[in-house]
């Protein structure tokens, strides 16, 4: 009886191993892309508009020695899987209202490519931008910033700009800002100017 039971289990094991199950092959590149996207999302998960500098220091986004600078660098430099050389924050009354990703890129096509990589990420999340501009290398003037795309989403504005520098170098910027804080800041400035008059 034990021999028959053993043979039946062995036969089932052999049949199970030889069945035509479809194996799921996940390409390694998609795993890498997913990992970098998840990593980038996690990096900014706790960063919120209106945070003060102490909160950002405690969460590790900025360092204490950088808070004395006019432009405060941020430690995370990616939007999705697109990495920038520099990222900085802007504050008003010690409250976060903007994050600026910027890079000095060689070559017009490389500059535009970087901006459109970011645009595609935001397209997937927010749909088509509210404003789109097509520029050519010849149409860009030195030290004049051109907006390539712009979203106004509830209380957030996302803007991608390019600026021609000397020779074949370009400044590329992606600005994400809280429009409520920006609006309050602008209103305060307007009120102050009108008071002077």
Cite the ranges covered by each PLM segment.
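Positively charged n-region of N-terminal signal peptides that target proteins for export
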Residues: 1-4
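Sec-dependent N-terminal signal peptides
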Residues: 6-9
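C-terminal motif of bacterial Sec signal peptides marking the signal peptidase cleavage site
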Residues: 14-16
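Bacterial signal peptide processing site
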Residues: 18-20
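Compositionally biased P/S/T/G-rich terminal and signal peptide-adjacent segments
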Residues: 22-33, 73-95
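Non-cytosolic coordination micro-motifs
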Residues: 22-67, 104-197
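Acidic (E/D-rich), amphipathic helical modules within compact regulatory domains
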Residues: 56, 65-80
């Amino acid at each position: 009886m034990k021999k028959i039971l053993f043979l039946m289990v062995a036969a089932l094991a052999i049949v199970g191993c030889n069945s035509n199950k479809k194996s799921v092959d996940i390409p390694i590149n998609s795993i890498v892309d997913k990992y970098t996207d998840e990593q980038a999302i996690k990096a900014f998960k706790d960063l919120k508009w209106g945070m003060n500098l102490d909160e950002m220091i405690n969460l590790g986004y900025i360092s204490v020695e950088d808070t004395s600078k006019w432009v405060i660098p941020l430690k995370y430099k990616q939007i999705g899987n697109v990495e920038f050389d520099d990222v900085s924050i802007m504050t008003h009354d010690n409250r976060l209202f903007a994050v600026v990703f910027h890079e000095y890129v060689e070559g017009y096509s490389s500059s535009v490519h970087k901006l459109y990589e970011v645009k595609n990420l935001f397209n997937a999340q927010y749909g088509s931008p509210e404003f789109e501009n097509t520029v050519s290398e010849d149409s860009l003037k030195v030290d004049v910033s051109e907006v390539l795309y712009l979203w106004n989403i509830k209380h957030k504005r996302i803007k991608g700009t390019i600026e021609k520098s000397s020779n074949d170098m370009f400044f590329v910027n992606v600005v994400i800002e809280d429009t409520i804080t920006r609006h309050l800041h602008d209103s305060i400035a307007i009120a102050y100017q009108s008071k002077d008059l």
